[in-house]
Design a protein with these regions (language model features):
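Conserved N-terminal beta-strand and adjoining loop/helix that marks the start
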Residues: 1-22, 91
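A generic structural micro-feature
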Residues: 3-7, 35, 80-86
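Residues that flank catalytic or metal-binding motifs in active/ligand-binding sites
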Residues: 9-11, 86-88, 104
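Active-site-adjacent beta-strand/loop module that shapes the phosphate/pyrophosphate-binding cleft
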Residues: 17, 75-98, 132, 136
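Conserved Nudix-box catalytic region and its N-terminal flanking loop in Nudix hydrolases
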Residues: 21-59
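Hydrophobic pocket-lining residues within nucleotide cofactor-binding pockets
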Residues: 43, 74, 94, 113-116
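A short coil-to-beta-strand element that immediately follows conserved catalytic motifs
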Residues: 63-72
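NUDIX/MutT-family hydrolases
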Residues: 91, 100-133
Length: 140
């Protein structure tokens, strides 16, 4: 049987409020250390992508989320410098007041769409955020 390299699978979560503000974490580790990013991370073996999204949101932000929409799958082979990583992005609601940086996050902050181009954002998360904002606005 031939050996096939398999991409890693991650989940990213766009946690938003009724004013279209959203939460980003500041990354504690490389790659993109000290850059802002969506909460998210690797899907564990035996775990659904949906459960990974909920778990990662809780681990990195202390926020319990309710997933709202599956936004898209992002699979460009070079989107992560660690190797080929495919991410599944979701929109989610949660109580911002519960937010606190944990795990791989060294900080957490609330941002508005108007500030998006001023922020140094990791990976392809700026594109993901823009896609999420389109879906959230459409569903208002």
């Amino acid at each position: 049987m031939a050996y096939h390299k398999i991409p890693s699978l991650t989940a990213d979560i766009f946690i938003f409020d009724d004013n279209l503000n959203f939460i980003l974490i500041k990354r504690r580790n490389d790659p993109f250390k000290n850059c802002w990013a969506l909460p998210g991370g690797f899907v564990e073996y035996g775990e659904s992508v949906e459960n990974a999204a909920i778990r990662e949101a809780k681990e990195e932000t202390s926020i319990d989320v309710e997933l709202i929409d599956l936004v898209n799958v992002y699979s460009e082979p070079d989107r992560d410098p660690r190797g080929h990583t495919i991410t599944v992005a979701y929109t989610a609601k949660g109580n911002f007041n519960d937010g606190k940086a944990e795990d791989d996050a060294c900080d957490i902050a609330i941002f508005s769409a108007e500030k998006l181009d001023e922020i140094k954002i990791a990976f392809d998360h700026k594109k993901i955020i823009k896609d999420c904002l389109k879906i959230v606005k459409k569903n208002l």
